[in-house]
A protein has these predicted regions:
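Polybasic, lysine-rich low-complexity intrinsically disordered segments
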Residues: 5-6
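Short, positively charged and aromatic/hydrophobic N-terminal segments
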Residues: 15-19
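Hydrophobic, membrane-interfacing alpha helices
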Residues: 20-232
């Protein structure tokens, strides 16, 4: 019994030390948000969160009853998630939305900058519109009901949203208002260097866990096509 208590205390101490060191070293993430650098190639945490999100959404949808009822194969789900959803929808749509709303001057001076996805700059609203359009094309190609498919897709979306918001946090972007709270962070991208709310983490919790639970509860209470999609 004494050994178990000592061992438990040691584990607890090590865990707290790990968390403390992780918090202290968060500035390294903000200053250099790259997971791996091989010559000119840089793999950023933000890009990794996008990929992880897509993979988890893929496995989630493979097991969803609506996907099975529709009769989509694994290859169909693969195409829908990675080609239609991630590339054409989220990335291309997100980039176009960002450039049209926030990078108009750059777009006018250099129209090809629309395709410079590696420079960053993705709009949530543009990505949402892009995903909707991409799924409409996919549904037309597969001859399936759009709202029937989106009822399954929106249940998986909070998984991606929650993880990508963590990527925004590690990227030091989309930070919140100034705060005097101990939970505030100083982001290198902030020209004023103020302590700010980690709004990305708030959104990760709200758009991730909370939204997933709400949509799951709504889905369990109704079989009407389009209801879950409309709540999303």
């Amino acid at each position: 019994i004494c050994f178990e208590k000592i061992n438990g205390s040691l584990v607890f101490y090590c865990f707290n030390l790990y968390v403390f060191n992780m918090i202290i070293e968060l500035s390294d993430f903000f200053n250099n948000p790259s997971l791996l650098e091989i010559g000119p190639l840089k793999i950023q945490y933000y890009a990794v969160t996008w990929l992880v999100s897509a993979i988890l959404i893929y496995f989630f949808l493979q097991q969803h009853k609506i996907i099975k009822e529709i009769g989509l194969s694994k290859n169909d789900v693969n195409d829908m998630v990675f080609m239609y959803g991630l590339f054409f929808g989220a990335m291309c749509g997100g980039r176009m939305g960002y450039m049209f709303f926030y990078g108009t001057e750059q777009l006018i001076n250099d129209p090809l900058s629309l395709f410079y996805i590696w420079q960053g700059g993705l709009s949530f609203h543009g990505g949402l519109v892009g995903v909707i359009v991409a799924l409409m094309v996919f549904c037309k190609k597969k001859n399936i009901a759009f709202l029937r498919l989106t009822d399954a897709v929106v249940l998986a979306m909070p998984i991606g949203l929650g993880i990508v918001r963590i990527g925004n946090f590690l990227n030091g972007e989309l930070y919140g208002r100034p705060t005097n709270g101990e939970w505030g962070f100083i982001f290198p991208t902030d020209p004023f260097g103020l302590l700010r709310h980690p709004s990305q983490l708030y959104e990760s919790l709200g758009e991730g866990l909370v939204l997933f639970v709400l949509l799951f509860l709504i889905n369990s209470k109704t079989n009407i096509k389009g209801i879950v999609s409309s709540f999303f």
